[in-house]
Swiss-Prot record:
Protein name as catalogued: Alpha-1B-glycoprotein
Signal peptide location: 1-18
Residue pairs linked by disulfide bridges in the UniProt entry: C49-C96, C153-C195, C245-C292, C343-C392, C441-C488
The Ig-like V-type domain, residue ranges: 22-126, 127-219, 220-312, 313-415, 416-512
Keyword Transport on entry: no
Lineage: Eukaryota, Metazoa, Chordata, Craniata, Vertebrata
The species this protein was found in: Mus musculus
Glycosites: N44, N89, N192, N369, N381, N389, N485
Main location: secreted
Cellular component GO terms, alphabetical: extracellular region
Gene3D superfamilies hit by this protein: Immunoglobulins
Keywords: Disulfide bond, Glycoprotein, Immunoglobulin domain, Repeat, Secreted, Signal
Tissue expression: Expressed in the liver hepatocytes of male and female GH transgenic mice and in the liver of female, but not of male, non-transgenic mice.
GO biological process: growth hormone receptor signaling pathway
Compartment(s) where it occurs, according to its Swiss-Prot or TrEMBL record: Secreted
């Protein structure tokens, strides 16, 4: 896997199972509307589907249901679907997709023969015109005397006039930048903003977009610092650890720090808003927590707030192994109870790590610093997913930072069925044809892969990896075929292999 792909996976940009042959930058085509006349936009309308890489096959989908497919003799970058006059028969929400031709002659699964679905285009045939989409870019906050941000307004119909309004302020703001169906408005003041558009000067404005709230912060928001990979692993030959620092917007410079000390470690930036640090554990004179911060072009005198701290552990396994005990000591534990795992060492003033055996790696799941000779780790509200073999390890907090080998393992066995997540529907009552159905799956532990499953189907309809205990799952383009009962479940990310139960179902009722 490439370094950039690793970083993207770490921060949540994942593909569904079996999608390794899908297109990357060209995987999502663009769809927009071109009226014959902006004076009467619904009198004769054409939808244009464009893709980054040439193809012979284009498909137009209305209200989540197949409508039209064309196969051309030669490869092209776009195709025009003529809808004509818009009536109740051809109004609705449209998306398109394009055929994928692999660079070599190989067999592709059915789903991998198509790009991702395009953006949605709403065609109503009436006024007011459909609302545009609006969002803040690159962040939804500003600082005193700092860089402005944009409110971006996206309209599916080309050639329109864009308008931005601030709540409580008279008048409209005209765009500062404009390109291919998107306009950007520079924002210098906090407030609530919405955009709309006109097809001609005497026309009625469209419905306003959803509100975009721009906040005022006293300083640049902190970046995120995290360990590359799902868990920390300790082994005697390990000399380097990789930390990733990601800013909320493009940065000119990053710093990796321990307390007030800036570490002179060269970093590599795969993107303008992120940097990777390769930390030589042998050269550290302090095992204390790491933080990172950034500063931006034109504002080099102002540093952001520090990230949340990240602690590391390593060990040369030269010191005596600690002893791990469990309270209660029974291997048969009841779900919902609390277990204390006590790690005892022969000396004081150490950093302790609780390890859990994966397949095959032994990884650190908790860390504690102690001024005494022991540390007590707690597992709360335990369930079958906590069953496994645990051990502990420690390291000195003064040079040369020697460490122990792992303790003898302690097995925890929790009774009962696996825990069930909770599936939440983020809509009310019914889902209209062509809309998205967005769910949120609430689990119990972080670092899992969550799946949306439908009654009667084995293959999940959506998959999302998360470093937290919940994830959003969505049906992108709901058609009549999507009606039914849905549940969610989750499985551990490597190196663990546990699986949750199935949530109670949520019914999707499709209207229209």
């Amino acid at each position: 896997m490439s370094l950039l792909a690793t970083v993207l996976l770490l921060w949540g940009f994942t593909l569904g199972p079996g999608n390794t042959l899908m297109l990357d930058s060209g995987s999502e085509p663009k769809l927009w509307a071109e009226p014959q006349s902006l004076l009467e936009p619904w009198a004769n309308l054409t939808l244009v589907c464009a893709v980054d890489l040439p193809t012979k096959v284009f498909e137009l989908i209305q209200n989540g249901w197949f409508l039209s497919q064309v196969r051309l003799e030669t490869q092209v970058l776009s195709y025009r679907f003529s809808l004509g006059a818009i009536t109740s028969n051809n109004s609705g929400i449209y998306r398109c997709r394009c055929g994928v031709e692999p660079p070599v002659d190989i067999h592709l699964p059915a789903l991998n023969k198509w790009t991702m679905l395009s953006n949605a285009v709403e065609v109503t045939g009436k006024e007011p015109l459909p609302r545009p989409l609006a969002h803040a870019d690159p962040v939804d906050w500003i600082t005193p005397g700092g860089l402005p941000v944009y409110v971006m307004c996206q309209v599916a119909m080309r050639g329109v006039t864009y308008l931005l309004r601030q709540e409580g302020v008279d008048g409209v703001q005209k765009p500062d930048v404009q390109h291919k169906g998107t306009a950007g408005f520079l924002i210098y003041k906090p407030g609530n903003y919405s955009c709309s558009y006109l097809t001609h000067a005497a026309g009625e404005p469209s419905e306003p977009s959803d509100i975009v709230t721009i906040k005022m912060y006293a300083s640049q928001a902190p970046p995120t610092l995290c360990l590359m990979g799902n868990y920390l692993m300790i082994y005697p030959q390990k000399t380097y650890e990789t930390l990733a620092c990601k800013a909320p917007r493009n940065a000119a410079e990053f710093q990796l720090r321990q307390g007030g000390k800036v570490l002179k470690i060269h970093g590599f930036s795969p993107t303008r808003d992120a940097i990777l640090y390769y930390v030589n554990l042998k050269e550290l004179d302090n095992p204390g927590p790491f933080t990172c911060r950034y500063r931006m072009h034109k504002y080099m005198h102002v540093w952001s707030e520090d990230s949340k701290p990240v602690e590391l552990m390593w060990s040369d396994e030269t010191l005596q192994a600690p002893v791990l005990t469990a309270e209660p000591s029974s291997r048969d534990l009841e779900p919902g109870s609390t277990v204390q795992l006590r790690c005892t060492a022969p000396v004081s003033g150490l950093r302790f790590g609780l390890q859990r055996q994966g397949k095959p790696e032994l990884v650190v799941v908790q860390m504690l610093n102690s001024s005494g000779t022991e540390a007590v780790f707690e597992l709360h509200n335990i369930s079958t997913i906590d069953s496994g073999n645990y051990s502990c390890i420690y390291m000195e907090q003064a040079p040369p930072f020697s460490g122990s080998s792992s303790s003898e393992p302690v097995e925890l066995r929790v009774n009962g069925p696996p825990p069930k997540p909770r599936l939440e529907a983020l809509w009310k009552s019914t889902v209209h044809l062509g809309q998205e159905a967005i769910f949120r799956c609430h689990g119990h532990v972080p670092r899992v892969s969550m799946e949306l499953v439908r009654e009667g189907f084995k293959t999940p309809f959506a998959v999302a990896s998360t470093r937290s205990t919940s994830a959003y799952l969505k049906l992108l383009f709901v058609g009549p075929q999507h009606a039914g009962n849905y549940s969610c479940r989750y499985t551990a990310l490597p190196p663990f292999t546990f699986e949750s139960g199935i949530s109670d179902p949520v019914e999707v009722i499709v209207e229209g």
